[in-house]
Amino acid sequence: MTAYVDLMAHDRQTRALAQVAGRLSWDQETMMPRGASEQRSEEQGAMAAILHARRTDPRVGDWISAAQPEDAVAEAKLRTIKRDYERELKVPAELATALARLTSRSQGIWADARASDDVALFLPVLKEVVDLSRDYAEAVAGDNQTPYDALVENYELGITADELHEMFDHMRPGLVALRERALGASPAPEISGLFDADTQIALANDIAARVGYDTTRGRLDLAVHPFSSGSGDDVRITTRIAEDDPFNCIYSTIHETGHACYEQGIDPAYRMTALGSGVSMGVHESQSRIYENQLGRSRAYCGWLYGQMRDRFGDIGVADEDALYRAVNRVHRGYIRTEADEVQYNLH
């Protein structure tokens, strides 16, 4: 039992440090001065080195071998830690550090390139990220496993690229046909006007709280790309503002709130353990999409949203609740996944 207790204590501290690294990433995308990018890259590299050393500590292997879990929960924790330990052992420490530094540095470069609409600024560092990601994939790939399959395991354990292709190949024809039918229907109404940024943020905070987001254990901020970060009692979300398109803010907020509520809703007994975060990216995305689409684009919700938008913004360019319902469910082609409608999103 001592081995199991020692392993859990070590693992808990490691996960606490990983949360600190996550807060550094959150800060970089929300609050950090732009000039701090190079220093933040070094800080993230240092955190990655510490985390890699803890995750590959030889004592972890000894504790795993000697541990005697007493119930199914303990077995699940041990199984997850063992899998992660064996995977981390395959990654050279220098590679783990280099990846953390590079991906941190590339974030600011991407944001600058996006703001100036100049992809050439980002392409060199993107190539570096891809090259290092290939090195990582080759390092962790198991027997008869392709590098891409090895990377997919970071997000959806046990699935392969072939299985994904089979699933997408099955989905695509129906989605394309549905999109063409929708595009051939009568045009949906569109909102019009300019929508004050501060008023959008106030509405976004209200939306998040009303669907269950606990703001005593989280906060909403602005970022170039909306995301959710953290777990347990510190789960933060971001959104973005376009004054000519309030749906960008509204539906990004609902989507990220779905992620956040999933994390906030995990049993407190599992916090800071191997079972203390979302089970997979697929399950995580199901929660955000349920909030965004099944809730946020429903007829009942649009009735509430119409009143909120009229009260806060005045005339929004659509006549009534039904018109807003059609507007938020409008199907259209587009290249931006986070702004895609319910049909187009899955084609991305």
What are these regions (language model features)?
Residues 101-248:
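Contiguous, non-catalytic segments that form substrate-binding/exosite surfaces or channel walls
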Residues 7, 141, 241, 245-268, ...:
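Active-site recognition of the HExxH zinc-binding catalytic motif
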Residues 1-157:
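A well-structured
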Residues 276-282:
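Divalent-cation-assisted or electrostatically stabilized phosphate/pyrophosphate-binding catalytic cores
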Residues 156, 176, 180-183, 208-212, ...:
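Hydrophobic/aromatic-lined pockets within catalytic cores
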Residues 21-28, 81-85, 184, 233, ...:
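Short acidic (Asp/Glu) and glycine-rich catalytic loops that position anionic groups and cofactors
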Residues 297-348:
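Long, amphipathic alpha-helical stalk/connector segments used for oligomerization, subunit docking
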Residues 122, 186-191, 270-275, 301-310:
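Short, glycine/acidic-rich hinge or "gate" loops at secondary-structure transitions
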